[in-house]
Amino acid sequence: MGSEQDQRKRWGGCLGVFSCFKSQKGGKRIVPASRIPEGGNVSASQPNGAHQAGVLNNQAAGGINLSLLAPPSSPASFTNSALPSTTQSPNCYLSLAANSPGGPSSSMYATGPYAHETQLVSPPVFSTFTTEPSTAPFTPPPELARLTAPSSPDVPYARFLTSSMDLKNSGKGHYNDLQATYSLYPGSPASALRSPISRASGDGLLSPQNGKCSRSDSGNTFGYDTNGVSTPLQESNFFCPETFAKFYLDHDPSVPQNGGRLSVSKDSDVYPTNGYGNGNQNRQNRSPKQDMEELEAYRASFGFSADEIITTSQYVEITDVMDGSFNTSAYSPSDGQKLLRREANLLSQTSPKSEADLDSQVVDFQSPKSSNSYKDHKQRNRIHADEEALLSRVGSVKGSRSYHISSSDAEVEYRRGRSLRESRENRHRKA
């Protein structure tokens, strides 16, 4: 026995160096004040004590206030109050012995405003004392909802974008419905814009019909009475002679005169194909004179003068104004030769031109000079006659303008280069 006690003492001395092997003899530990009741030692310190159904003993003989062992976290820690477990419990009395040996569990309580006040974790109670008044604005009446954007059933885009087949078969009916439903605001910048297919309430334009525009009804599309008021008729098409030219030039002086040049493709612009694909039929049924008139109407709707139009089989880009040769793509349509009419020089308009000078301004795009030069010469004479009639007709329309003709920088540069080239050719001829 003695040897065993000595052996234990030796092991205890060796292991006593480490604090974890030292005997714990009622040492006092610093714990948070919210965990320690302010009444001193209570019966809850007993590990397996019996449950108590009354108020816990709040006094301990000779005990000191344990809340002073730790620095107070708030001034309220100095005051003695009732046990936290009994003040905030649902039944007003709760024994600490019913909890774990270490005291009440921390997950059951939430720390209150002060360190010694704990509150039970419970769903929030909404009352007039705990909830703040709402800061939301007054709910608008349902009458004001009509002033905002329309709801989804009222938007025609779902019907407008149903399928591509519907758009092809119905022509431009959906566009007219969309234009009528969503009209432009009066003050918006885009409300002043007009196009040949627009159908606004005050511009007097009609939607294009699928029918072919004939020569007889083309001039009567907009009937002008003695008072000068335009009366739109039912028959109209995208391009009709003297229709949009008279409307834009006589009744809309606000259209700016930019004086630029427009290169128009006869295959795509002059012959619009509708949804039924009868563009080739319309192309075959039209005479050259009617083509030039429709081209002039198309040109006049965009504010170009008669000598500022270039008609090509394709869109031609002029890179050098001093170069007399023009290049185009290898593609050419099969319905005859396409001629490029070079515009007349403003400096030499007063001097009369001979037939040779007019013929020298026509460039053949199709093929080099061949044996059918007589036919080409006949065709050129006919085109020049049509152009002269066209210029005489448009001159009366242009006489009603109250503003002068302006030219862009590119136009001035092109005319300067052309005049230099023609003067050089004249010097070579004289030499």
From Swiss-Prot:
Which spans does this entry mark as compositional bias, Basic and acidic residues?
412-425
Region of interest: Disordered: 31-55, 257-291, 365-431
Looking at the UniProt entry, the stretches that span the membrane are none
Polar residues biased stretches? 42-55
Q: Which domain of life is it from?
A: Eukaryota
This chain belongs to the protein called: Uncharacterized protein At1g76660
